[in-house]
């Protein structure tokens, strides 16, 4: 298939600039794979569309406040580092701006100078290996003090509260972007879901900035996916296998949870406790084995994420659902509304 097959027209005003308040007040489009019906609901009504014995699989990765604004030593020139991936210890792979002026040996100070960084090397793709020095026990404490959330480029409004870009169950630090389908859940909603006999299990996939990288190749099969680290615990693997054995549904909350489970299935032919890196690319023609349902937001045109949705729900039905969402003025992208494909 071609990249242009996944294009749709989206008015700018439908790109959500802030989350729904409360979180579960977002709209929910319910798509039924058996009868092709489309229902329009609200996210706090999600429990009504779940069945006793279902299992929701959420991604518990936590977004790092990884965007650091600093000054070069000794010139005082303003620069920016965006932490992408921990290489080893206090050395991280970073996106640097202005990249050409941050050559190996460049020193940068942040805040009051209690956090500093030195550029070690420039990688072939232009990213940098950077080593940090700080006066606290962990680098994460300094990121909390000086860092900002690395919001997607289509969100131009500043957050009032950085927790708005974290799920309520986020715990494993490491993502450069939020697993946004989970932003709609509140503690109260999760309690209601559990009270109906629906289980909730956690996986971890640290979302990289590659999630926003456009597909440049015209033939989508030529696209190379970015690699992301994932982990599935023994408890989660057991819950998933018990759910499937009992004939109940495994429902992925978000494309990251979906990609985690499908990556494990692709590697082992079943769900087992494991961790590793995955660059799995799911698009029409790729069969999904690990999930029976998917909760997700509305994604960018021509993105790998809308291609994943089309693989699970069907290409024609996916594009028709997006056309309906635009007509019904759903809110799109990270802070937007959700769909539940069941």
Language model regions located:
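Surface-exposed, charge/polar-rich loops and edge strands
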Residues: 1-342
């Amino acid at each position: 298939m071609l990249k242009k097959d996944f294009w749709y027209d989206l008015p700018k005003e439908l790109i959500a600039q802030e989350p729904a308040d409360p979180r579960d007040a977002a709209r929910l489009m319910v798509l039924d794979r058996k009868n092709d019906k489309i229902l329009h609901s609200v996210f706090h009504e999600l429990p009504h569309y779940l069945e006793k014995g279902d299992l929701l699989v959420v991604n518990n990765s936590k977004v790092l406040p990884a965007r650091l604004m600093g000054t070069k030593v000794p010139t005082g020139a303003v620069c920016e580092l965006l932490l992408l991936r921990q290489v080893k210890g206090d050395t991280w792979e970073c996106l640097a701006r202005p990249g050409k002026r941050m050559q190996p040996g460049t020193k940068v100070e942040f805040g009051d100078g209690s956090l500093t960084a030195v550029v070690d090397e420039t990688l072939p793709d232009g990213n940098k290996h950077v080593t940090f020095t700080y006066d606290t026990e962990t680098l994460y404490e300094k990121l909390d003090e000086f860092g900002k959330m690395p919001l997607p480029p289509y969100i131009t409004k500043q957050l009032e509260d950085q927790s708005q870009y974290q799920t309520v169950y986020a715990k494993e630090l490491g993502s450069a972007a939020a697993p946004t389908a989970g932003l709609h859940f509140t503690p109260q909603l999760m309690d209601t879901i559990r009270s109906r006999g629906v289980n909730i299990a956690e996986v971890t996939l640290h979302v990289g900035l590659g999630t926003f990288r456009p597909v440049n190749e015209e033939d989508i099969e030529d696209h190379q996916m970015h690699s992301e680290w994932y982990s599935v615990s023994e408890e989660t693997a057991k819950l998933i296998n018990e759910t499937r054995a009992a004939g109940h549904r495994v429902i992925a909350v978000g494309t990251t949870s979906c990609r985690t489970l499908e990556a494990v299935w692709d590697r082992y032919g079943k769900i087992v406790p494991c961790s590793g890196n995955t660059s799995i690319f799911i698009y029409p023609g790729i069969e999904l084995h690990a999930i029976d349902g998917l909760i997700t937001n509305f994604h960018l045109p021509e993105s790998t994420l809308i291609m994943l949705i089309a693989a699970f729900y069907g290409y024609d039905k996916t594009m028709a659902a997006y056309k309906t969402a635009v007509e019904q003025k759903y809110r799109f992208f990270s802070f937007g509304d959700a769909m539940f494909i069941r």
